[in-house]
Amino acid sequence: HGYPGHQEIELALVKLYRVTREKKYLDLAKYFIDLRGTGKNYFLEEEKRPGHKRIFPDFVNYDTMYAQAHKPVRKQRTAEGHAVRANYMYSAMADLAYEYQDKELQQACRNLWDNMVHKRMYITGSVGSSGFLERFTTDYDLPNDSNYSETCATIALAMFGKRMADMEKKHPSPY
């Protein structure tokens, strides 16, 4: 089994669950989140197939960190890879932590939030310092001259912050 490449379906599945109260949608979102970073990466496996044609040349540099699939989400401690995808995934993780009252997932969300806002965020509140693959780089690498800080990443960060406040049941909150 695999999981979606771009973490957005998990958010939609949680919303669908909240509207229908059909747990199968919530369970599928949890399945995708829990599977990420474990076992084979089917996107890398596809590239190994004979005759594979790369549609996007920039993806010659694709790695599992780009898609937050370098390790299971519960073991991730630093914001990595594509900044929008990351914050969408973190938002879904916070939603699932709230719905399942999953303490381990809640702690993973806190760890990722703390790393991002204390070590990988500009003073303006933007995230994602590299224009190359629109991604996070390393702690405190926040260049002024090549700052990327895509608007979508900042909006996704706001989504994550709102969900962190909901998860922690703190209003007003530090998130």
Please state what every model-predicted region is.
Residues 1-175:
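Glycan-recognition and catalytic cores of secretory/periplasmic carbohydrate-active enzymes
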